[in-house]
């Protein structure tokens, strides 16, 4: 009986030590992971809006996100949300445009989160990806310039995906074999553009 109790105590101590060690490792790795994610996010922001020196929050615009959520959901862009909005600033701290992040849950592989840059005049400066888990060689091609750069330089408008070749300024050529991904990304862009037009450009 004493042997059984002794073995149980030893097992408990080993389990306790292992749990403490795992918890410590988790805590140690949390900060580097967060730093890496923040670095990647900053790099995407800079890619989307290269003219900006920094980005800053605007409390009024942040509050407008929740207020506009229902209206954006009713626009037919799919299951999309606007997640955040930041002002794009020049070296003097002047606002030169905006960076809006949005998410579509209708990607083939799950949610897709993007960042959209817009100038003060309503021209798209670019589209970048913050999170995407689509099929390699198909939906992941959304990250390639051939697809995402179709939005750059265009004025704020509602975009649509076409599989027959873009004939109008608001048409976006679908990725071959990845129409679902193409529509999800375009829906997220449309949500960001709508927020800009409804809450910023007014």
Label every model-predicted segment.
Residues 2-202:
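Flexible, solvent-exposed loop/hinge segments and secondary-structure transition points
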